[in-house]
Amino acid sequence: MKRKMPQKTGIVMIAAGAVLILAALLLLLYNNAVSERAGRESDAVMDGLRAAIAQREQRKTRETAPDVIAAPDTAAPEADVTSDTTAAVTTDAETEPAAPRTEMTVVAVNGHDYIGYIEIPAISLSLPVMAEWSDERLKITPCRHFGATWTDDLVIAGHNYRRHFASLKKLVPGDGVSFTDMDGNVIEYAVTKSETMLPTAVDAVQNSGHDLVLYTCTYSGDTRTVVFCDRTEPT
């Protein structure tokens, strides 16, 4: 009986190893399925976002276009502006500069609120960005975690799905990034640097001093890949 113990132990270890390999394979298949589903949902949202932005731009054009009215046959005599000695009155409200805008336009698409979409040509990425962050929302698209484009402190979080932010680690300084908001404004950025940071480094991400920050989990889940970007000067 004693001689059979090592053989039985070996069989148990082989069986346990096979179970672990099978579990890892099933986990890989599950993660791939989740990633593909997230990619399909993001693609569907992108179509809706582009359509919504186009509609808003058309509406804006119609609202700002001047009304053309045919002049009557007997037009009123033109006013002699040179003889008008009444001084124009300018109120304090008219002279004060408008307060800087801080809030981004939010539009609902497929039941969720979005602030626009991000494009990163270097890794062939085009993804919608939800207005608010949550674990459930991240399963669909990347989400705004902090800030806004207007205040140059936008932070976008995304899962490390293959169709989402898994390729952030491939970006290098100088790679271009663009963000299109729901008003049709396109903001151009360039990657400044990339770092691997702990999940607790919230302040370093939120108050980085950079105009745009993108981040995702590493495969271990213990750290974060963080990409810092800054606006590029218009050419």
Predicted regions and their residues:
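Solvent-exposed, non-transmembrane regions of membrane-associated and secreted proteins
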Residues: 8-235
